[in-house]
């Protein structure tokens, strides 16, 4: 009996590892399926009914992409169409083999005020809320797993879902006058785009509970003190702060795309997978760069790195 139980545990763990590996690496794989009551095409049709704004993507020759949340008349709130466009841009970025880094920003010097209330008012049932929740969790999880080093450039306000989006980025930078606020409690809800889970990982459970239950207004100084952001930029000017963010990001993406992308994938697997599976993935990723052009060039130079 004990042997059978041990075998069952082993099989369960193997199945779980296999599922998690597929989840991490299979492009287009959804967190949810019809078995969870999630019908993606139906959700897309619903979201299509709420137009407004756009998600704009600019891909630079230096391997940095700039993703702009563009709905300034509503503080860059997400309309239904913008949610759909965000998924489209994530898929495009998944296939951008020359990409190394990504900056997420809002148009007109403000980040985002979250969901467009016009859409929210029309999606009033718990079933509606959970459907959008699953759609955005899918999208932002795929975003988080992009093989690009991502930075949220917080200019102005990041409210509600906008604050949640910042947590899907690898790093966050704020301008001196900007603020982040998880305002969900004041709306009678909780974060539902994965923001709670990611916030706990970023600042710890105690700080996350304070930030969420207090609906705290985090200015740049407070956000820096609790580890929410990496740095406060010098300028609040829209153009200058974007230039600062680009310079900040460049220090982490020096090198060939295949190496930067492998590093990001390895970190993702280390965060999300069991130890054995993460180590195997690290091995497989090493195989994609060992003996490659960058590796051979570094060996030929016989560089010293302890200076």
From Swiss-Prot:
InterPro entries: ClpP/crotonase-like_dom_sf, Enoyl-CoA_hyd/isom_CS, Enoyl-CoA_hydra/iso
E.C. code: 4.1.1.94
Top-rank taxon: Eukaryota
Keywords: Acetylation, Cytoplasm, Lyase
Chain positions found as N6-acetyllysine: 217
Main location: cytoplasm
GO molecular function (one): carboxy-lyase activity
Family: Belongs to the enoyl-CoA hydratase/isomerase family.
Function: Decarboxylates ethylmalonyl-CoA, a potentially toxic metabolite, to form butyryl-CoA, suggesting it might be involved in metabolite proofreading. Acts preferentially on (S)-ethylmalonyl-CoA but also has some activity on the (R)-isomer. Also has methylmalonyl-CoA decarboxylase activity at lower level.
Protein name (record): Ethylmalonyl-CoA decarboxylase
Organism: Homo sapiens
Underlying gene: ECHDC1
